[in-house]
Amino acid sequence: MISAIVQAREDSSRLPNKVLKKIINKENSISLIIKRLNKSKYIKKIIIAVPHESKKFDYLKKKFKNIELFKGKKHNVLDRYYSAASFFNVTTVVRITSDCPLIDFRLLDKMIKNFKKLKVNYYSNCITRTFPDGYDIEIFDLKK
């Protein structure tokens, strides 16, 4: 199953709660990302991975019926991704960060299609910068 995992947190040293601040049409970054990911043909599940301590993201389960909220280790983002993927039996992870509200679902679908066609384990547009910052997408298979 192809799932998007969006890592989010409240504490940012430069701009606390930045992903929860209203930016476009009274929407915050995380809501915009969810709406854009919902347009993908390939994403079967959207998982928001937040630290255990986070309470400010709980409203998302009421606002969006098709998302899952996973709470994991605050200071180990990699473990949070892995634990969320394992918990929900994800086979292919689409890694998105919550401070990229302009993510393009058409680009995402094209990348997922290429990932499947090429049969690679990892596919990204941010190792060699091919798109502007904010369009970062990483796709990888989770082998157990």
Locations of regions flagged by a protein language model:
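Short glycine-enriched, charge-decorated loop/helix-capping segments at active-site entrances
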Residues: 18-24
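Short beta-strand segments
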Residues: 7, 96-97, 125-126
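Conserved core of the sugar-phosphate nucleotidyltransferase
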Residues: 103-144
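Short, high-confidence coil segments that cap the C-terminus of an alpha-helix
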Residues: 43, 90, 117-121
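Short phosphate-binding loop-to-helix
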Residues: 52-116
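N-terminal nucleotide-binding beta1-loop-alpha1 segment
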Residues: 1-16
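Short internal beta-strands
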Residues: 47-51
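A short, N-terminal amphipathic alpha-helix
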Residues: 28-45
